[in-house]
Every structure is written in structure tokens, then in C-alpha cells.
């Protein structure tokens, strides 16, 4: 669930729902819990767990995943588990960034693979059709593609925001990566935002973009 934006929004706008969020970060758990408490949200529970090990405490009418599958490899197994967590008429909504035609792994093969090494180690760039290929347990009902220029503008906004707050960001980088690597990581994060902005803007945003998928359980 990342830093909880979607979870908090759902819990706040649908107060009669019970929202379960999963993060592999204790820091994210603590932040989401603090924000929920400050807003008087009491229908949200946050679990700290690796998704590979997560055991759902119940079944759900809706499951939402935002940019998690890019960090996973075994789509078939995860789809099977999600199907088991869904109620019979439930739906799974999946948000991923993807390439137009070709899935590929992020593998650190040498000095030039800094993106794989520092930001997406073990991850994968899905292709737009990849969720359609694992249809044993979940079927894609609807599929939307969002032009990559939207994401490019988002990445530029993140870069501008970080640059404008350098004085407050540098101490965080120092605490996270150490004194000697503070400036190096500042530049790495700037390179990350710039490289990704260029990626999603390529070919008018039609090469890399965001995919949305609505899936339902396969009747067996």
C-alpha cells in the first residue's frame, strides 16, 4: 500500500467499509497509522508483511494493487492467491506501469545497470498484455491504458518538489545512506526521476505507460 494514499482515501470516503492494507515497511505502517488517527479514521488496519508471505485474515469484495506487481515475478501464483481472497462476486483492480509489447526483468548485469541495482532490484517491467496471460484464476474484464505523458509530468513534479526542498531532503538521505553517500544518493534520485520522465514521454507516451485492469474470479 506504499504510504497509504489509496487506503486512506478509500477508508475516508467509504466509512462503512473495512480496509486492510499491506506494506513491507514498518515506517510506512507507522505513518499510515498516524495519519489515520489524526483524521479520525477507524476502519483501516495496516499489516507489515512481505506479500509473498501474506495470509489474508478474511475474504474481500474488492482488492486493489497499485504498482506492486512490478516488484513481483510469479504472477500466476499471486493471481491464484488473490482469487482465493476474493468473494465469489468480488473484483481485483490492478495498476501497473508497463511497456507496449515487451516484458523484461530488471537484472544487474554490470556497471551501467544502476536502475536495476539501486531502484528495481529483482523487479520486472510488465508488458501491457501480461495480466491477460495468467487466466487460470482471474480473468481481465476491462483494461485501460493511460498515456505515458501523464506519468512523465508526475515524475517531473516529483523532481521539482525534491529540488525545491533540498535543504530538508539532504538530512534524510544522510540518515538513510550515510554521510559519505549523501550527495551520491541525491544525484541518483535526480537521475531516477529524469530517466523515468524521459522513458514515459518517449514516442508521445505510447511506448511506456500505465495500465489499469479490472479482474474477476474464474468460475471453476
Regions found by a protein language model. Give the residues of each.
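Conserved SAM-binding loop of SAM-dependent methyltransferases across substrates and taxa
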Residues: 3-15
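Conserved SAM-binding motif I beta-strand of class I
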Residues: 18-23
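Conserved SAM-binding loop
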Residues: 32-33
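Conserved SAM-binding strand-loop segment of SAM-dependent methyltransferases
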Residues: 38-51
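A short acidic, Gly/Pro-enriched loop at the edge of an enzyme's catalytic core
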Residues: 52-63
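A short SAM/SAH-binding and catalytic strip from SAM-dependent methyltransferases
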Residues: 62-74
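A short glycine-rich, Lys/Arg-flanked "PGG" loop and its adjoining helix->strand segment in the class I
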Residues: 76-91
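Substrate-binding/catalytic lobe of Class I Rossmann-like enzymes that use SAM or dcSAM, i.e.
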Residues: 98-100, 104-210, 216-220
Amino acid at each position: 500500500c506504499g504510504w497509504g494514499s489509496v487506503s486512506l482515501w478509500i477508508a475516508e470516503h467509504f466509512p462503512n467499509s473495512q480496509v486492510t492494507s499491506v506494506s513491507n515497511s514498518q515506517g510506512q505502517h507507522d505513518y499510515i497509522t498516524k495519519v489515520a488517527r489524526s483524521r479520525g479514521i477507524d476502519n483501516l488496519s495496516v499489516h507489515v508483511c512481505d506479500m509473498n508471505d501474506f495470509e489474508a485474515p478474511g475474504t474481500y469484495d474488492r482488492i486493489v494493487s497499485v504498482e506492486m506487481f512490478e516488484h513481483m515475478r510469479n504472477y500466476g501464483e499471486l493471481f491464484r492467491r488473490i482469487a482465493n481472497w476474493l468473494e465469489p462476486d468480488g473484483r481485483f483492480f490492478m495498476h501497473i506501469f508497463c511497456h507496449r509489447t515487451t516484458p523484461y526483468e530488471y537484472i544487474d548485469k554490470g556497471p551501467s545497470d544502476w536502475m536495476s541495482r539501486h531502484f528495481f532490484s529483482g523487479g520486472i517491467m510488465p508488458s501491457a498484455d501480461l495480466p491477460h496471460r495468467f487466466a487460470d484464476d482471474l480473468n481481465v474484464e476491462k483494461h485501460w491504458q493511460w498515456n505515458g505523458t501523464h506519468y512523465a509530468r508526475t515524475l517531473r513534479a516529483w523532481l521539482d518538489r525534491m529540488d525545491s526542498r533540498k535543504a530538508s531532503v539532504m538530512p534524510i538521505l544522510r540518515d538513510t545512506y550515510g554521510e559519505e553517500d549523501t550527495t551520491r544518493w541525491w544525484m541518483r534520485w535526480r537521475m531516477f526521476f529524469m530517466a523515468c520522465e524521459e522513458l514515459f514521454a518517449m514516442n508521445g507516451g505510447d511506448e511506456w505507460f500505465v495500465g489499469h485492469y479490472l479482474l474477476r474470479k474464474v468460475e471453476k
